[in-house]
Amino acid sequence: MTENIITETRPSIYGLTRDQLIEWAIENGEKKFRATQVWDWLYRKRVQSFEEMSNLSAAFIDKLNEHFILNPLEQVVVQESADGTVKYLFMLPDQMMIETVLMRQSYGLSVCVTTQVGCNMGCTFCASGILKKERDVTAGEIVSQIMLVQKYFDERGLDERVSHVVVMGIGEPFDNYEHLMNFLRVINDDNGLAIGARHITVSTCGFMPAKIKEFAHENLQINLAISLHAPNNELRTSLMRITRNAPLEKLFEAIDYYTETTNRRVTYEYIMLSGENDSPEIAQQLADLIKPRNKLSYVNLIPYNPVAEHIKYERSTKDNTAKFYDVLKKNGINCVVRQEHGTDIDAACGQLRSKQIKKNKAKLA
């Protein structure tokens, strides 16, 4: 006999922008200011139920409950690192799981959110792609990741708030574009969480260069990061199969369009893999690729977090990383070696989720 899993069909109200919430309220016979009150309860007072919205009528609260849920996520696992990094595993209403990471930075609290359940991009070094994409994460489910992290501080009476967001968790954000854009507009709204656009970064592997061009016209000051990891097509294809359909020539044509349109800097993420992409010769190739664009470029060299399923890859040595960095600096490239977070927990993106799913399967076996 199999257990019936009841799946919640109501969407999370967190998935609506303020304008969408106002439109919904008016369509349901309410005044515009009622939607503004709901928005205030959600993001300024950060209530945990519609019933706590004390200046709304019982009839309106019933209507909200009929159409929406508030928080669709359930906390399953929390891992805390000695450096203050916290990794969360959340369960979605359909029993699927996603990861979220809180990082304490010198400039504030940064949260890394997940946009897809699994990933189909097929990067050969990444834990996220071990389990293929099941579905997109909705805008409400992405916002809920921020709200649950913020709840941790609110419940403890701590005067701290999430100040920065990086969309670099499991999945490819531009493969979930509509929900991504709603999420960004919700958290950036000055009347809500008010997370500054320049404090938000979206990362893409560039699998669809046209999406980078589309992003250039969204009229947001949000930062763009490119998961690059190699300066030539042959090497990049061996690491990231999406390069077959989106070679560097197409990718950089879109990036150049983006920078010309927005005049905003692009960050290039480059994971340092021992013996794969960390030689001085490859560093020079990277410098040659970035140099014509250096005014609006920044290279982020990232120490690799080993993944059990990808045993062929090892972290580049500190010496090789330093030599690579020196080549870039000698060529005038703006670059940094990224500070590590959560090295004493399941630090690699997707690692905690993969472990939990294996554990659940073992229990059922």
Swiss-Prot record:
Keywords, ordered alphabetically: 4Fe-4S, Cytoplasm, Disulfide bond, Iron, Iron-sulfur, Metal-binding, Methyltransferase, rRNA processing, S-adenosyl-L-methionine, Transferase, tRNA processing
Cofactor note: Binds 1 [4Fe-4S] cluster. The cluster is coordinated with 3 cysteines and an exchangeable S-adenosyl-L-methionine.
Binding site for S-adenosyl-L-methionine: 171-172, 203, 227-229, 305
Disulfide cysteine pairs (residue numbers): 112-349
Enzyme class per UniProt: transferase
Keyword Secreted listed: no
Primary location recorded for the protein, binned into one broad class: cytoplasm
Reactions performed catalytically: adenosine(2503) in 23S rRNA + 2 reduced [2Fe-2S]-[ferredoxin] + 2 S-adenosyl-L-methionine = 2-methyladenosine(2503) in 23S rRNA + 5'-deoxyadenosine + L-methionine + 2 oxidized [2Fe-2S]-[ferredoxin] + S-adenosyl-L-homocysteine; adenosine(37) in tRNA + 2 reduced [2Fe-2S]-[ferredoxin] + 2 S-adenosyl-L-methionine = 2-methyladenosine(37) in tRNA + 5'-deoxyadenosine + L-methionine + 2 oxidized [2Fe-2S]-[ferredoxin] + S-adenosyl-L-homocysteine
Annotated active site: 99 (proton acceptor), 349 (s-methylcysteine intermediate)
Gene Ontology CC: one annotated term: cytoplasm
Keyword Metal-binding found: yes
A Pfam cross-reference name: RlmN_N
Positions bound to [4Fe-4S] cluster: 119, 123, 126
Function: Specifically methylates position 2 of adenine 2503 in 23S rRNA and position 2 of adenine 37 in tRNAs.
Extra remark: Reaction proceeds by a ping-pong mechanism involving intermediate methylation of a conserved cysteine residue.
UniProt protein name: Probable dual-specificity RNA methyltransferase RlmN
Source lineage: Bacteria, Bacillati, Bacillota, Bacilli, Lactobacillales
